[in-house]
Amino acid sequence: SRGLGDVYKRQFLYRGWDVTTTGNPLAHAILRGGVDKYGTCVPNYHYEDLMRLWELYQKRDLQFPAAVVDANHSNSDKKFREQPRIVSEVLHSRRHSEDLRRLVKGVMIESYLEEGCQPIEGERVYGKSITDPCLGWEDTQRLILEMAERA
């Protein structure tokens, strides 16, 4: 629930400065999973996770519940090819719950022109990530079209 704090007025120290915010009633949660104390990726995109977030929004009586699910990172256990399956599950959850249709505003996928990733040193392939592995363009296009059909 720490992520929901941005909707409220805050006061904190930042690099020696006393900072006060007005809060942001339009703030949203980004669900990218997490890592436990053993280094294991722990996803948070499942139906139960989304419903728990919805309940936290309701308990705090927040006006604009909003979440975006990151289909990669810890939600995919850093296995980028799992992104289409994760997006499909999120869409399935939205179809079966009016609350989740209100809550989940979108998904994030990591994609680039070429699939995978490459080291920054040496010869590089144009359009291939030098950071996280990504879906290639064809898989991304297919995923977007499938999402449009299911939405």
Could you tell me what each predicted segment is?
Residues 9-20, 46-62, 90-96:
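Structured alpha-helical segments in the cores of large, soluble enzyme domains
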Residues 18, 23-40:
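Positively charged, amphipathic and often flexible ligand-engagement surfaces
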Residues 32-36, 72-76, 107-114:
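Active-site beta-loop-alpha junctions enriched in small/polar residues
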Residues 69, 136:
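Conserved, mostly hydrophobic/aromatic
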Residues 90-116:
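Substrate-binding cleft of secreted/luminal carbohydrate-active enzymes
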